[in-house]
Amino acid sequence: MELILKQDVQNLGFKDDIVSVKAGYGRNYLIPQGFAHMATSSAKKVLAENLKQRAHKEAKVVADAKTLGDALKAIEIKISAKAGGEKLFGSITNIDIAEALAKGGQSIDRKFITSGIVKRTGKYNASVRLHRDVIVELAYEIVAEQA
């Protein structure tokens, strides 16, 4: 079954992609949730025309995402957390990284930040997906909170 995605679906594709999925997944989940619609021949023609019109706008969006990526790399992120020696009491997740970025002046949704769960102090990297073509590696440091 071929479907046209209306929005980004994790592990499947991006908005306006034509994807092939099993019939049950399409009929019972993607279409009822509003994530996709049937890829008929007329829908494919309309999609092709829309993509042509959107191509030049997309170039500007990619350039803006790259500029934002450069700004993110310039921010030095230090997250302080309670720790006993090297081990943290709790953990640092993408939510904490998003909050640290917001304090640095860049608001990024936590869904676009990919980072493992960190339970020790030290330096780590996280991936930030700003656009389907722009993924930035972000360095951050976890330090023990001073009591």
From Swiss-Prot:
InterPro entries: Ribosomal_bL9, Ribosomal_bL9/RNase_H1_N, Ribosomal_bL9_bac/chp, Ribosomal_bL9_C, Ribosomal_bL9_C_sf, Ribosomal_bL9_N, Ribosomal_bL9_N_sf
GO biological process, one term: translation
Keywords recorded for this protein, A-Z: Ribonucleoprotein, Ribosomal protein, RNA-binding, rRNA-binding
One Pfam family named in its UniProt record: Ribosomal_L9_N
Coiled coil: none
GO cellular component annotations of the record: ribonucleoprotein complex; ribosome
GO MF annotations, alphabetized: rRNA binding; structural constituent of ribosome
Purpose of the protein: Binds to the 23S rRNA.
PANTHER family per the UniProt record, alphabetical: 50S RIBOSOMAL PROTEIN L9 (PTHR21368)
Family statement drawn from the similarity comment of this UniProt entry: Belongs to the bacterial ribosomal protein bL9 family.
Protein name: Large ribosomal subunit protein bL9
Classification of source organism: Bacteria, Pseudomonadati, Bacteroidota, Flavobacteriia, Flavobacteriales
